[in-house]
Amino acid sequence: MEFSIHICEYNRSNTDCETIYRPEGSGDYLFLLFKKPMKVYDGTAFIIAQENACLFYTLDHEQHYQAVQKLRNSYVHFWCGENLGEKYGIPQNTVFYPQNTEAIDELIRLQQREYIVKDPYAVEYEEALVRQMMIMASRGMRRRSRPDCTRNFRSCALRC
C-alpha cells in the first residue's frame, strides 16, 4: 500500500512565537490547520495567516512558519503514492481558507486516534480519513468561491 501517516496531532500547542523551518521540506505531505494566526513565509516575505487557515505542503517544498503569539494547530504528515492536493484541487504550498474547518479538525482528531490506537485495518482507515479531509477541504474552497451558497446543505446543493 502506498500510504502511511508519519505523525498526526490534533489541537497541538507549542511555545509562544515558535518557528518551524524545514528548508528542504519534510519529505512527506503536510496538511496544517492553524488555530491561531501564523506568519507564513511565501517565498518572498512573511504573510499573516489568520485563524482557521489551512496549508498543504508538498513533499520537498520549504516549510517556514512562525506563531504570531501562541502556536496552536492540528496537522497530519503523511506519505501517499499520489499528490492528493493535485487530485482534489487543493491549493499547494500556499495558505487557503476553506469554510468547513470544524469538520476538517474533527477528521484530524479521528486520524490522531487511529494513528495512536492502531485498531484492525488502521492504515486503510487512516487513508480514508486523509482522503475525506482533502475532499472536505476542496469542497470548503468551492463553497467559499460561490458566495450564493449557504451553509445549509440542501439549499446549496440545489443552487450550486
Spell out what each predicted region is:
Residues 2-94:
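N-terminal regulatory/effector-sensing and dimerization cores
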Residues 76, 80, 101-160:
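An amphipathic alpha-helical interaction segment
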Residues 95-99:
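Short acidic-hydrophobic, aromatic-tinged amphipathic segments that line or gate anion-handling sites
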